[in-house]
Amino acid sequence: MSNQAAKLAKFLLEIKAVKLSPSEPFTWTSGILSPIYCDNRMVLSYPEVRTFVAEELAQLIQREFPEATRIAGIATAGIAHGALAADKLNMPYCYVRPEPKKHGLKNQVEGEMNPGDKIVLVEDLISTGKSSFQAVEGVQNAGAEVIGIVALFTYGFANAMEKFVNAGIPVHTLTNLPTLTKVAAEYGFIQDNELATVNRFAENPSAWGESL
């Protein structure tokens, strides 16, 4: 657990971007029932946290993907974080929808993206990886190459991470669920029984929901 990962985890807990509800689980877009919900949009409302995230994402992109020619946010929650990071790096920016619009220009990529561009996608969080792969497909359809994905947070689900490995797409995040739970326990944001519930969920998300 790096100092910066722990710092962001504490920020997310302090601004209540992370919500716990073991007795009344959240239903994700994917249909997964979860005792935890991470709303990284909250980061945008807090200047100190917003600046920290933008700087950390920019440094992460610069360190891991120096060959990148363009940053692309993943709609919708990754749009703002991607734009802020691209601004720090003074790099071209666009964003990618899950699918082409049904009207107007019917774009999936909004903004300029050129064939041959080396793209780093910016996501707010990674759970099942579905939205990330939809964006990857959109970039590839535009004739560009996804060289990596960065995100604020990952649940670290094994199935999702395996998909990225198999696709040959490196993924780097600023913090993750194990760090978050450790920091939450250390600073009293979470009770022992809640911690045990989150840990069981992380081990097997589908089985946890089915056991309710």
List each model region and its residues.
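PRPP-associated nucleotide enzymes
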Residues: 1-122, 130-212
